[in-house]
Amino acid sequence: MVSKGKTVKDPGIPNITIPEKVCEDEDCPYHGSLRVRGITLEGVIVKYRGTKAAVIERQYLYYDSKYKRYERRRSRIHAHVPPCINVREGDKVIIGECRPLSKSISFVVLGKVS
């Protein structure tokens, strides 16, 4: 549990503002003990479940060398949403890789892109 006098951690990701709201979530990169390591990605929330989990979709271009053209692809990533970050479906967010939190969740939402 987080005590009231404990300082807020800064994960060191550029262009991320630390949330003003304080949460008691142990899987929060700001107020808990979750460490962010690995890659950081940017995507749009397409589904937000009430169980502190969201589905983030990112679209990217893939070069097909046979036809010498680019094709659009998408990937859907499941991510944990801490209670101190207010997001809704359609918001553009930055997610960071962390340890596996469940069978399909290995990313955490770090903040909204404004």
Curated annotation (Swiss-Prot):
Keywords: Ribonucleoprotein, Ribosomal protein, RNA-binding, rRNA-binding
Molecular function in Gene Ontology: rRNA binding; structural constituent of ribosome
Listed Gene3D superfamilies: 2.40.50.1000
Parts forming coiled coils: none
GO cellular component entries: cytosolic small ribosomal subunit
Superkingdom of origin organism: Archaea
SUPFAM superfamilies per record: Nucleic acid-binding proteins
InterPro entries tied to this protein: NA-bd_OB-fold (IPR012340), Ribosomal_uS17 (IPR000266), Ribosomal_uS17_arc/euk (IPR028333), Ribosomal_uS17_archaeal (IPR019978), Ribosomal_uS17_CS (IPR019979)
Gene Ontology biological-process entries: translation
Family classification: Belongs to the universal ribosomal protein uS17 family.
NCBIfam families named among the record's database cross-references: PRK08572.1 (NF006345), uS17_arch (TIGR03630)
Its job: One of the primary rRNA binding proteins, it binds specifically to the 5'-end of 16S ribosomal RNA.
Protein name in the entry: Small ribosomal subunit protein uS17
Organism: Saccharolobus solfataricus (strain ATCC 35092 / DSM 1617 / JCM 11322 / P2)
